[in-house]
C-alpha cells in the first residue's frame, strides 16, 4: 500500500542571509589568526539576539591572512544566492578599526543615492555592524589591540548579480552583502521591495525627474519606446505597486508613470496595492460597471461580467467601441493620486501581451 502523504505541506524553512555568512566566515578567519584555532563551525549572534551555528566549508591560513567559507543556505526561499560559496579573507592591521573590501563576486557602489557612499564595497550597514561587533568581541577576548581588514567574496557572484537589480542600481562587479535580521524569511519579498525603494532613491539622487514603474519586461519595453527612458529611470516593481506609491511620500519624484498589463492595472484601479493573484483578483462585474459608465449597453455589461479573462472583457468592449482601457486607467490614476503627494504628477498606461497600449490616463 502506498504511504499516505500529508494534506498540509511542511512549514517553509527559513535561511540565513549573505550578511550572516560573511559574519561567520570573518569571525572564523580572525579566530584562526588570533588563536590558531581552526573551526569546522562557528556560532554567531544575530541582530535580535538569536545564536545560530554555521558550518564552514574550509578555514585556512594563506600567507599572513586567513580565510574561511560557508555555503549560503536560503532555506525554502527562491534566493539567487542559495548554495553559493561565501568566503571572507581577514588580515590583521597595526591600527585599530575594521576596513571592508569588495572581493571576488561582491559589487562596488558607483552611483549616489544608496545608503553606502560611491566607491564603497556593497556590504550593507547591518552586515558591517555584525562583522564589526563579532571581531571586536574576539579582539577584546584575546587582548588584541590592532585592527582587521575584511575582504568578502561570493563565488560566481558577478554572474549571479546579473539576475538582480544591482546593475540598474549602479552596484557593479557583483552581489550585495545583505540582511537586516540575519535571517531569510521564505517569500517575504522584503529584499525585492527594498530594491524598489533603492531604485527610486538612486534615480532621484541622480537628478531624474521622471521615473516609470513597470510590472514586467513588456511594460519596460513600452516605456523605453514611448519616452526613451534610461535604465536608471525604469523601476521594476513587479506586483508591488504599493511599494512605489508609498515610497514617493518620502521621495516625491516630480513625475511618475505606471505601466502594466491590463489585468494588473484593473487591480490597481480597484484599489489594490499588491497585484499578485495571491492577494488580489480582477473584478469583472466592476469592469462591466465602468464600461456602463461610458456607454456600454446591458448586453455588453453582461458579456463583460461573464468573460473568462480581463483580456476577453477588453476585447468585447473594444469591439463595441467602448474605451474600457482608458476608463480603467482613469480609475487607476485616481487611486494612485490618492496615495502619492499632490506635487507628484502621475500617469498610467495599460498594455496588452504584445506591449501595445490599450489604455492611458493623465498623460501630459
From Swiss-Prot:
InterPro entries xref list: CbiD (IPR002748), CbiD_sf (IPR036074)
Pfam families: CbiD
Domain of life: Bacteria
Family annotation (SUPFAM superfamilies): CbiD-like
GO terms of biological process kind: anaerobic cobalamin biosynthetic process; methylation
Catalytic reactions on record: Co-precorrin-5B + S-adenosyl-L-methionine = Co-precorrin-6A + S-adenosyl-L-homocysteine
Functional pathway: Cofactor biosynthesis; adenosylcobalamin biosynthesis; cob(II)yrinate a,c-diamide from sirohydrochlorin (anaerobic route): step 6/10
Top enzyme class: transferase
Keyword Amino-acid biosynthesis part of the UniProt annotation: no
Keywords (A to Z) from UniProt: Cobalamin biosynthesis, Methyltransferase, S-adenosyl-L-methionine, Transferase
Molecular function as annotated in GO: cobalt-precorrin-5B C1-methyltransferase activity
Its EC number(s): 2.1.1.195
Membership in a protein family: Belongs to the CbiD family.
Protein name (Swiss-Prot/TrEMBL): Cobalt-precorrin-5B C(1)-methyltransferase
Amino acid at each position: 500500500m502506498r504511504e499516505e502523504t500529508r494534506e498540509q505541506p511542511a512549514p517553509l524553512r527559513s535561511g540565513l542571509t549573505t550578511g550572516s555568512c560573511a559574519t561567520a566566515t570573518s569571525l572564523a578567519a580572525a579566530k584562526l589568526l588570533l588563536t590558531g584555532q581552526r573551526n569546522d563551525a562557528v556560532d554567531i549572534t544575530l541582530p535580535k539576539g538569536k545564536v545560530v551555528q554555521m558550518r564552514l566549508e574550509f578555514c585556512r591560513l594563506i600567507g599572513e591572512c586567513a580565510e574561511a567559507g560557508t555555503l549560503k543556505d536560503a532555506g525554502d526561499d527562491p534566493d539567487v544566492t542559495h548554495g553559493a560559496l561565501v568566503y571572507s579573507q581577514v588580515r590583521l592591521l597595526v591600527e585599530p578599526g575594521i576596513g571592508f573590501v569588495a572581493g571576488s563576486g561582491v559589487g562596488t557602489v558607483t552611483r549616489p543615492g544608496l545608503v553606502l557612499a560611491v566607491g564603497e564595497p556593497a556590504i550593507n550597514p547591518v552586515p558591517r555592524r555584525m562583522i564589526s561587533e563579532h571581531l571586536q568581541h574576539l579582539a577584546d577576548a584575546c587582548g588584541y589591540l590592532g585592527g582587521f581588514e575584511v575582504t568578502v567574496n561570493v563565488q560566481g557572484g558577478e554572474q549571479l548579480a546579473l539576475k538582480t537589480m544591482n546593475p540598474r542600481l549602479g552596484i557593479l562587479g557583483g552581489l550585495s552583502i545583505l540582511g537586516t535580521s540575519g535571517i531569510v524569511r521564505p517569500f517575504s519579498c522584503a529584499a525585492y521591495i527594498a530594491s524598489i525603494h533603492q531604485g527610486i532613491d538612486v534615480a532621484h539622487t541622480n537628478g531624474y525627474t521622471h521615473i516609470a514603474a513597470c510590472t514586467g519586461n513588456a511594460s519596460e519595453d513600452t516605456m523605453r519606446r514611448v519616452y526613451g527612458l534610461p535604465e536608471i529611470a525604469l523601476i521594476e516593481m513587479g506586483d508591488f505597486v504599493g511599494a512605489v506609491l508609498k515610497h514617493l511620500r518620502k521621495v516625491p519624484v516630480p513625475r511618475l508613470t505606471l505601466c502594466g498589463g491590463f489585468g494588473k492595472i484593473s487591480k490597481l484601479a480597484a484599489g489594490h496595492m499588491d497585484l499578485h493573484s495571491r492577494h488580489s483578483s480582477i473584478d469583472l462585474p466592476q469592469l462591466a460597471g465602468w464600461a456602463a459608465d461610458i456607454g456600454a449597453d446591458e448586453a455588453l455589461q453582461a458579456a463583460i461580467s461573464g468573460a473568462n479573462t480581463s483580456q476577453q472583457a477588453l476585447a468585447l468592449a473594444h469591439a463595441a467601441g467602448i474605451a474600457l482601457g482608458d476608463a480603467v486607467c482613469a480609475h487607476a490614476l485616481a487611486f494612485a493620486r490618492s496615495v502619492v503627494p499632490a506635487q507628484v504628477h502621475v500617469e498610467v498606461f495599460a498594455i496588452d501581451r504584445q506591449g501595445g497600449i490599450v489604455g492611458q490616463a493623465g498623460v501630459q
